Amino acid sequence: MKPLLGTFYLLGMLVPGWLGYDRSLTQQRQEVVDKVVSPWSILETYSYNRYHPMGEIYQWMSEIREKYTEVVTQHFLGMTYESRPMYYLKISQPSSNPKKIIWMDCGIHAREWIAPAFCQWFVKEILQNYEDNSRIRRLLKNLDFYVLPVLNIDGYIYTWTTDRLWRKSRSSHNNGTCFGTDLNRNFDASWCSIGASHNCESLTFCGTGPMSEPETKAVSSFIESKKENIACFLTMHSYGQLILVPYGYTKNKSNNHEELIQVGQKAANALKAKHGTNYRVGSSADILYATSGSSRDWARDIGIPFSYTFELRDNGTYGFVLPETQIQATCEETMEAVLSVLDDVYEKYWYTNSARKAKSTALVLGLLMSFMSLL
């Protein structure tokens, strides 16, 4: 930990109940951010090969927004159970044409630290390379990226202060006798029907009802409002080295299952080509275990065509406590996989439509010329 940031790391723990309710919500959430960020800039020396506490991630988001004002905006999504603000970054180039949205969230399970590390890596790679890398430039010209670096902020902070292997959120249940909901069992996708528990002490406690948690409400409300334009929903997890497609709650397949598998396998091949890491591709019900209430299945159920869960390194040697020495390689190979998925989304939703428009235009011009020749 950098000496200058030590104090702000501690402030980043944010004791619940701090916010005064006589102030506006905007003032409240700004106070939270003000109290966890350092007055010194961290961006120039920010290491993407380290895990960062939430205070540093808040500050990183603010400084990324300030440095790349031409393409980055920061947006409020909602408040966590313990009254911390949830922000996402929108990376977008101005365009006169409608653009499809790519959604990516990380850290829905608190202990999976490599996931937020990848979200930060993804943002860094896009912003540092979009001007010179033709592949990224083409994608950003036609797609908007919405990135939520840490979804389960309360739980993530708890893994830094108290229990490194904490999984759930930090909501209170049974009169304060047990804590936390598995946010990836709380979405309205065959909620709590299989692979989840109604026991609040369970790691897979599904909550008191679908979307019962403020974090899942915030995400689902936003996604619902944009679903007509969202082409791809990516949620990053660990561990297991898997690319999962819907569904977890049934062995039945989505109506575009073969396409999802094909795109996913291509991504796994791109990932393997980087460092030789093997990933398996399939539905959770087929290659992992049955689950209900996942964000991936919910996203597909509401009509988002491409919906994937990435389970990053490793296969169990280190499990959730993946060493920092593996961050770079993990992020490099995952970046190749994600770009492969985005290439396919681009081909389907932009290139194909453009080609169709060009063909229609050529047909109209041909008919017009034929008509003119008869005059």
Curated annotation (Swiss-Prot):
Query: Per the entry, which co-factors are needed?
Result: Zn(2+)
Query: Which residues make up the binding site for Zn(2+)?
Result: 109, 112, 237
Signal peptide range: 1-20
EC code: 3.4.17.-
Asked if the keyword Zinc belongs to this entry, the reply reads yes
User: What is this entry's stated membrane topology?
Assistant: Lipid-anchor; GPI-anchor
Q: Which InterPro entries match?
A: Carboxypeptidase_O, Peptidase_M14
| Superkingdom of the source species | Eukaryota
Q: Which residues are processed away as propeptide to yield the mature protein?
A: 355-375
Keyword match Translocase:
no
- Lipidation (GPI-anchor amidated serine) at which residues? 354
Ranges of residues in domain Peptidase M14? 50-345
Q: Which UniProt keywords apply?
A: Carboxypeptidase, Cell membrane, Glycoprotein, GPI-anchor, Hydrolase, Lipoprotein, Membrane, Metal-binding, Metalloprotease, Protease, Signal, Zinc
The UniProt entry's GO CC annotations, sorted and at most eight, read: apical plasma membrane; extracellular space; side of membrane
The molecule here is called Carboxypeptidase O
